[in-house]
Amino acid sequence: YKRQQKLNTLASIGEFKGELGDLTVHVELGKDTITISDRGIGLTAEEIEKYINQIAFSGANDFLEKYKNDANAIIGHFGLGFYSAFMVAKKVEIITKSYRDDAKAVKWTCDGSPEFTIEEIEKADRGSDIILYIDDDCKEFLEEARVSELLKKYCSFLPVPIAFGKKKEWKDGKQIET
């Protein structure tokens, strides 16, 4: 939400020209991944270093160990909400490109340890994709009904809509996905 506000502010003062993007959640069963995507302001390599690495790795491991059996206790802790992803994912990737004209796209990869990689990549559009590679013992989070339930529980009051799944409608006497 704060990143959306920043994008709105940048647009209002003429520093950003473009459309505000969609927030989507996509499950890919064959790869056991959940991808959360937006067309927001994105991140630079420096911002990933500052906001993802420095904040999260300063105490995140101890915090996650303390609350590993109570995911609800993590919600709202600055810098640690993102790292709760490692409670269900064996690896997380962030593929992102900042709104800045001179920005290079980057991919950050981490397995939950303090070790990570960051590399420049090609990405046409601004925004971010966060890809969770779901642990074998957490496959329930790949089920459409479970993801839907969690999105409704934790995201229904967000000021931006989240697209997930396919819409079902009746056509020619049967239900189809669109």
Features from the language model and the residues they span:
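A short amphipathic beta-strand at an alpha->beta junction
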Residues: 159-170
